[in-house]
Regions:
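Membrane-interface extramembranous regions
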Residues: 1-139
Length: 139
């Protein structure tokens, strides 16, 4: 889980930074976006990816914070992806997303939530009778 959290954080930060270098802050809410790899991006999505990645880089130093980071990525990314499917290609999509970017958000969100919600029950060793703390005798 920690490795996936670090991978997501670094990938989002790099994606956001390179995207901002490509788009700058011109046409901040361009509904069409510009092509980047197989995605379309605009400054809105780049800033969101960069901030999410930088927060994640800071949070993935500890396992408990990495788990919270993945919970945030999943809890925020899942509705983000669903809305992306609904408004994709319309003028309401001021993030300029395309289906590939929406699929990416959905996949990362689902894997993040799966890792957070997956319960690994600890295997407890069999208990041995212990001394009674009151009288010092055995149980």
């Amino acid at each position: 889980m920690l490795g996936f959290a670090r991978l997501v954080a670094h990938a989002l930060a790099a994606f956001g930074l390179v995207g901002l270098l490509m788009t700058g802050f011109d046409y901040f809410s361009n509904v069409t976006g510009i092509p980047f790899l197989m995605f379309t991006i605009n400054p809105n999505t780049n800033v969101i990816h960069l901030v999410t990645g930088l927060v994640g880089i800071e949070m993935t130093g500890r396992a408990d914070l990495a788990r919270r980071y993945l919970l945030l990525v999943g809890a925020m990314g899942l509705p983000w992806a669903v809305v992306g499917y609904v408004v994709e290609g319309t003028m309401a999509d001021f993030f300029g997303r395309n289906p590939a970017l929406v699929h990416f958000h959905l996949g990362v969100s689902l894997v993040a939530l799966l890792l957070v919600l997956w319960r690994r029950w600890p295997v407890l060793p069999p208990t041995q009778p212990t001394a009674d703390p009151v009288d010092g005798g055995s149980i």
